[in-house]
Amino acid sequence: MSDFRVPCGAAETEFTEKRSRFIGHLLPVETEEQAREFIAQMKKKYYDARHNCWCYLIGSDILRYGDDGEPQGTAGQPMLNVFRRENVTNVVCVVTRYFGGILLGAGGLTRAYSKSARDALAAAGVAEMGLRSEERR
């Protein structure tokens, strides 16, 4: 038997770090198409934001992320790492940043995007799922 975890539902969280506003959105998904559609919806909704960074994991094989103009490795990858550490799959997360005028630096960006993903996951909740072998006798 192999276990995995999935988000219980959609979630939205928000916090401010040095005047930059971070809005985290999380949604359970089952296909890459659903994930890409959600990312497109968030980019359209927050068209005036400086950055709409995203990541998704589907099953054990499909994982993607995007930094949307933030320095490489400071947004999408740290968000993805949150879900990998928690063994969560079938999830898409978009974090929108409205720049507040104060540079956060690479470490500050990494911490802020990770926090936003963690907060959204905590707000959504997580369900344990199991795959059972059909070899019962």
Where are each of the predicted segments found?
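Solvent-exposed alpha-helical segments within well-ordered globular domains of core cellular machineries
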Residues: 33-40, 44, 81, 111, ...
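Glycine- and acidic-rich phosphate- and metal-coordinating loops
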Residues: 57, 89-99
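Conserved mixed alpha/beta catalytic, RNA-binding, or beta-rich assembly cores of soluble enzyme
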Residues: 72, 76-84, 109-113
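Short, flexible loop/turn motifs enriched in small residues
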Residues: 48-50, 85-88
